[in-house]
């Protein structure tokens, strides 16, 4: 119905229809420059002004029959110019008031509501520059009564709109684009709507009447404005990014009317359209205009358009009639769009359509969100804004679509390629023979998730979802490098991949003596191991003799006894020296006892040998004890011989005991080595303890008269007194009769020293 154009009348209908669709969002450039929290309306003052206006209008309406009263009410009305508000009723309905009053209301709304514009001139001066129809003629009392006055006032209003612009000298003083704001003047074009269409429209209004006002719909009512607050920055935080262009405040956005036309065709009873006025971009603000003045402009009532949203260029007669009523209702109740609308390609005209309106049945299906140009922003800021707009679109548009309710706010943090990369890593971790070791936390998380799903299922019989991972059979491959006889080292992977001339192996020729000596060493070791194994087989036969003897009949036991003697003799002969019958070969003894298994063999063999042969073996051990102790530092197996050797010592005669002590002392310097070994010290104490037992038990013992024994005991006593306590090894046990033995051969002072040293060794044991 109402169509406005700027002074530049070159915006054609095709250009208007070709405008790009954009969302009803705030202008990002304006918010980045001034911030979104700068609007601070004084609602108490507005509330007071609205209350005064309501009281004065009520005083005017009851006296409609009196022309003076009506005229006074009109003047009172014109003296107070409140800002438009969606919550209060500024103007009466068109059924209750005249058409002239409607025009006056429009003029007051545009020129008088804003404090910034009202400060330019007084109300009386404003009215002096207005056309005579709006300033000099108050409504007649009869205009408030019938439909004829309604049509007459409407016709006067149309004539005012089609009359053409006033001189620039008259408009300039109160132009909303001039003075301190620095905008170019805006005029109303008179050639938009013809008189023929107006006459047809008036005839339809006479016949049909004005339709009821539809309830105003706005999608901005339930919106939380806190989510529209971007960071209050005027430029991008990234150094080197393009600067933000200074675009004038108040330049409305461009928006086509395709969605509004669809809603008009689908719902003709509730049409809410706005007059779309294409306009050239006004010049920028002068440098003297501060941000505070810009904020006052943004807070002014002029920031909300008083006209309905986008008018269809070609409307039917019924739609025009409905539009007349919807305009008045929009003035009183409908909230106006925001002043600044952001979009691609700059700012849009002030009276342009601010965005598609949501109809009573929700947004049109298939409408894709339009993204703003945020290439000048920081990447992190751009991501935050895109997520905010997406979440806001889901919140508003998802009321009618159920599939958008459960949108993940973190869905845009990773790209699809990154998600696939993480999924592949998880699948590689799951291909494991021991998942609890390789991916412990994921296995526990999955078990907890399954238990939670089972609890939420309320004991319903459903198949639990199991993670099916591909079973990849792991082929155990053991790399065996190729070896060549005489080559240096092993072949490497680089040698296989990059073949080269092999290094010439230098063949070192050894002498025959070295080869013979090496063969002898290997043969000797093989011979020792063979001898030990053969002796073990004989020892097992000897150990099983008692079982076989009890199970064998009496007439066969003699044969079994002969076999037992033969096996025992073979065991001793493997240790005996060839030239001597009662002497163990030192070399053979050392060879066998140099092996750990050989030492265990001797400890198991001693109880089965006859007493003379066992004594010979013990003497051979005592004779070669320093060498055996040196080889037994790691094995520590000689201590296993203490028990069988003590049994053999207790069965010896005094002469054999003296010979054993002499073999243990050996040559000069052997006794200190014996005292440093645990088995050697224990063996010495056993020999001395057995001699003391013989002397104390038998007064006629030959040891008292044997000078060798006495000299050996003196030698041992001197060595014990001389050796330091740290060098004396602790024995396995200390016989208690050693003190009485030493008391026979030393004085009391030395006896106390020996006793103290023996106690120390006993405590250290």
UniProtKB/Swiss-Prot annotation:
In-chain residues carrying the UniProt-annotated modification Phosphoserine: 235-236
GO MF entries: RNA binding
Record-linked Pfam families: PAT1
This protein's UniProt keywords: Cytoplasm, Nucleus, Phosphoprotein, RNA-binding
Disordered, as annotated region: 1-98, 119-147, 210-244
Bias type Acidic residues, positions: 7-30
Compartment(s) where it occurs, according to its Swiss-Prot or TrEMBL record: Cytoplasm, P-body; Nucleus; Nucleus, PML body; Nucleus speckle
Keyword Translocase: no
GO cellular component: nuclear speck; P-body; PML body
Biased composition (Low complexity): 235-244
InterPro entries on file: Pat1-like (IPR039900), PAT1_dom (IPR019167)
Biased segments, Basic and acidic residues type: 45-59, 218-227
Gene Ontology process terms (BP): deadenylation-dependent decapping of nuclear-transcribed mRNA; P-body assembly
Family membership noted in the UniProt record: Belongs to the PAT1 family.
Physiological role: RNA-binding protein involved in deadenylation-dependent decapping of mRNAs, leading to the degradation of mRNAs. Acts as a scaffold protein that connects deadenylation and decapping machinery. Required for cytoplasmic mRNA processing body (P-body) assembly.
Subunit structure as annotated in this protein's UniProt entry: Interacts with ribonucleoprotein complex components.
Protein name (record): Protein PAT1 homolog 1
Source lineage: Eukaryota, Metazoa, Chordata, Craniata, Vertebrata
Gene that produces this protein: patl1
């Amino acid at each position: 119905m109402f169509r406005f154009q700027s002074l530049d009348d070159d915006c054609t209908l095709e250009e208007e229809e070709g405008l790009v669709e954009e969302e009803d969002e705030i202008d990002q450039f304006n918010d980045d420059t001034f911030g979104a929290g700068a609007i601070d309306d004084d609602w108490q003052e507005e509330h007071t002004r609205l209350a005064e206006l309501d009281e004065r209008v009520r005083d005017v309406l009851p006296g409609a029959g009196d022309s003076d009263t009506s005229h006074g009410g009109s003047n009172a009305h014109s003296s107070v110019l409140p800002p438009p508000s969606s919550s209060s009723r500024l103007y009466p309905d068109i059924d209750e008031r005249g058409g002239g009053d409607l025009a006056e209301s429009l003029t007051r709304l545009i020129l008088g509501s804003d404090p910034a514009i009202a400060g330019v001139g007084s109300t009386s001066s404003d009215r002096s520059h207005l056309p005579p129809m709006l300033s000099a003629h108050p409504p007649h009392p009869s205009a408030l009564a019938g439909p004829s006055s309604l049509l007459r006032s409407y016709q006067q209003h149309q004539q005012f709109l089609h009359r053409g612009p006033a001189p620039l000298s008259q408009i300039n003083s109160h132009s909303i684009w001039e003075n301190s704001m620095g905008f170019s003047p805006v005029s109303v074009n008179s050639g938009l709507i013809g008189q023929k269409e107006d006459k047809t429209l008036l005839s339809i209004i006479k016949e049909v009447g004005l339709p009821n006002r539809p309830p105003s719909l706005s999608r901005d009512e339930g919106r939380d404005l806190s989510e529209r607050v971007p960071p209050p920055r005027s430029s991008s935080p990234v150094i080197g990014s393009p600067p933000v262009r200074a675009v004038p405040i108040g330049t409305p956005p461009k928006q086509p009317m395709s969605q509004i036309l669809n809603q008009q065709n689908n719902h003709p009873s509730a049409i809410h359209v706005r007059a779309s006025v294409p306009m050239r971009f006004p010049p920028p603000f002068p440098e003297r205009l501060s941000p505070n003045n810009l904020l006052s402009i943004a807070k002014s009532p002029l920031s909300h358009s008083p006209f309905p949203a986008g008018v269809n260029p070609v409307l039917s007669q019924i739609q025009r009639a409905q539009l007349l009523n919807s305009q008045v209702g929009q003035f009183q109740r409908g909230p106006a769009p925001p002043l600044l609308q952001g979009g691609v390609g700059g700012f849009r005209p002030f009276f342009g359509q601010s965005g598609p309106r949501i109809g009573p049945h929700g947004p049109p299906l298939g409408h894709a969100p339009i993204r703003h140009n945020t290439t000048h922003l920081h990447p992190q800021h751009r991501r935050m804004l895109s997520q905010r707009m997406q979440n806001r679109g889901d919140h508003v548009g998802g009321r009618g679509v159920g599939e958008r309710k459960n949108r993940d706010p973190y869905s845009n943090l990773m790209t699809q390629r990154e998600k696939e990369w993480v999924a592949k890593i998880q699948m590689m971790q799951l291909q494991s023979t021991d998942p609890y070791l390789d991916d412990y936390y994921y296995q526990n998380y999955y078990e907890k998730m399954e238990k939670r799903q089972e609890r939420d299922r309320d004991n319903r019989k459903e198949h639990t979802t199991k993670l099916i991972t591909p079973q990849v059979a792991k082929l155990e491959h053991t790399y065996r490098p190729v070896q060549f006889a005489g080559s240096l080292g092993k072949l490497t992977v680089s040698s296989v991949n990059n073949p080269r001339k092999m290094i010439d192996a230098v063949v070192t020729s050894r002498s025959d003596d070295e080869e013979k000596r090496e063969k002898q060493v290997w043969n000797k070791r093989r011979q020792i191991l063979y001898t030990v194994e053969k002796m073990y087989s004989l020892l097992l036969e000897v150990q099983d003799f008692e079982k076989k003897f009890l199970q064998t009949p009496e007439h066969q036991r003699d044969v079994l006894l002969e076999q037992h003697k033969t096996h025992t003799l073979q065991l001793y002969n493997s240790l005996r020296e060839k030239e001597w019958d009662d002497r163990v070969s030192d070399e053979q003894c050392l060879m066998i006892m140099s092996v750990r298994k050989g030492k265990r063999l001797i400890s198991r063999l001693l109880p089965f040998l006859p007493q003379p042969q066992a004594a010979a073996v013990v003497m051979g051990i005592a004779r070669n004890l320093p060498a055996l102790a040196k080889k037994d530092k790691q094995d520590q197996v000689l201590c296993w011989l203490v028990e069988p050797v003590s049994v053999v010592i207790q069965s010896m005669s005094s002469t054999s005991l003296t010979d054993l002590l002499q073999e243990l002392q050996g040559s000069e310097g052997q006794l200190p080595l014996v005292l440093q070994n645990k088995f050697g010290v224990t063996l010495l104490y056993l020999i001395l303890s057995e001699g003391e037992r013989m002397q104390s038990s038998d007064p006629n013992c030959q040891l008292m008269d044997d000078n060798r024994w006495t000299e050996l005991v003196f030698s041992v006593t001197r060595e014990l007194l001389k050796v330091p306590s740290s060098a004396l090894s602790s024995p396995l046990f200390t016989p208690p009769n050693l003190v009485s033995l030493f008391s026979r051969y030393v004085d009391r002072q030395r006896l106390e020293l020996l006793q103290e040293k023996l106690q120390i060794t006993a405590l250290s044991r």
